[in-house]
């Protein structure tokens, strides 16, 4: 898809407690058509800042009038987006408890690949967005021949298995190579998700699996509670959108798991949202979202403890009650299949994309056998 660079300037102003001392900065954005259906007709869903790094920069999330895909529009282009991924964004926590969490999560992720794992003979896995390589190493220990894709500098640290250090859609391999391809919390970050789905179809062997996790745009958490990591999250998908992407790419949906088994997506601020929209009959904007307890402590320079807890209760009684309601709200969401994130398992069709397709971006020649840094 051809993208038009517009000279749109991001809105720049302070947002409540997130207002910082940083000077206003002009950000050149691009306006794009829907990546799924090509329509340029859309409506605004919400506006919110980059709460993580640049709280004075606001972005707009829109929904396509034709297919319902959600996306940031206008958005930072491929060059501009780099400033929103500083080096420390890729730093992982180092603690025994976090290591245990990763092992538990990787075990759950591996279950989605059991069908392939139980087949006789060697099996090859490509993990897209492999970060520092921990999940591929986990799978290698289970007997898989692993490779990864990671465009950040962290990929340079990986020496024990092959890594593609460029966009997944741009790697030069075109023939069916892998028994499984995984993308955990990746497809919401990319500028051209259709190219990623198509590339997965090209590289999968017949009957191979594409397993991916992403936010659920049909959920209150994603759509209404301002917990998406904008502008790093660029796209927001419903299950209908996923089915359409898979159809275009020659993949068939096998199942969706909407239970939050890989990444949790807690409905924080659900009660304040319900009070505002159902009782007060008013719109719930980003400025209406209470600070989290962590944000509140940081703002007021408080240590975690009873004093901080009481002050937070006085600041937002609804938020304190909200936290206690999460388990019940999540249980209902899971029953209704409206939890904040979903994991999908798709299979390659017998007849799918065969030609070597690349987007307009520059392609660098590489092969998994070349090892790290390619």
Question: What are these model-derived regions, one by one?
Answer:
Residues 1, 5-9, 353, 363-366, ...:
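Short hydrophobic transmembrane-like helices used for membrane targeting/insertion
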Residues 5, 9, 18-97:
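N-terminal juxtadomain amphipathic helix
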Residues 57-61, 68, 184, 338-344:
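Short hydrophobic/aromatic beta-strand or adjacent loop that forms the aromatic wall/cage
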Residues 95-111:
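Conserved SAM-binding loop and adjacent beta-strand
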């Amino acid at each position: 898809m051809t993208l038009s660079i517009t000279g749109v300037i991001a809105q720049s102003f302070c947002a409540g407690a997130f207002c910082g001392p940083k000077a206003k900065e002009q950000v050149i954005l691009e306006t794009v058509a829907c990546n799924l259906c090509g329509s340029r007709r859309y409506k605004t869903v919400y506006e919110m800042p980059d709460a993580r790094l640049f709280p004075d920069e606001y972005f707009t999330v829109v929904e396509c009038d034709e297919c319902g895909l959600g996306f940031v529009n206008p958005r930072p282009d491929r060059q501009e987006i780099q400033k929103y991924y500083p080096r420390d964004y890729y730093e992982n926590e180092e603690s025994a408890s976090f290591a245990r969490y990763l092992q538990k999560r990787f075990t759950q992720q591996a279950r989605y690949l059991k069908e392939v794992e139980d087949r006789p003979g060697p099996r090859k896995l490509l993990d897209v967005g492999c970060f520092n390589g921990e999940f591929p190493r986990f799978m290698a220990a289970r007997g898989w021949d692993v490779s990864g894709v990671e465009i950040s500098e962290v990929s340079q640290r990986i020496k024990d298995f092959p890594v593609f250090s460029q966009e997944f859609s741009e790697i030069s391999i075109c023939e069916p190579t892998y028994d499984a391809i995984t993308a955990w919390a990746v497809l919401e970050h990319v500028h051209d998700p259709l190219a990623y789905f198509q590339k997965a179809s090209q590289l999968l062997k017949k009957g191979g699996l594409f397993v991916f996790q992403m936010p659920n745009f049909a959920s209150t958490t994603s759509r209404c509670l301002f917990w998406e990591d904008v502008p790093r999250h660029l796209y927001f998908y419903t299950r209908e959108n996923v089915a359409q992407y898979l159809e275009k790419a020659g993949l068939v949906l096998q199942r969706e798991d909407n239970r939050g088994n890989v990444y949790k997506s807690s409905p924080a601020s659900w009660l304040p949202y319900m009070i505002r929209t159902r009782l007060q009959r008013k719109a719930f904007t980003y400025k209406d979202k209470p600070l989290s307890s962590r944000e509140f402590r940081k703002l007021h320079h408080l240590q975690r403890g009873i004093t901080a807890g009481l002050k937070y209760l006085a600041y937002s009684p609804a938020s304190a009650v909200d936290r206690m309601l999460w388990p019940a709200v999540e249980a209902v969401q899971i029953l209704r299949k409206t939890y904040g994130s979903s994991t999908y398992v798709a299979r390659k069709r017998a007849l799918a994309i065969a030609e070597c397709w690349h987007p307009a971006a520059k392609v660098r020649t590489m092969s998994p056998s070349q090892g790290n840094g390619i």
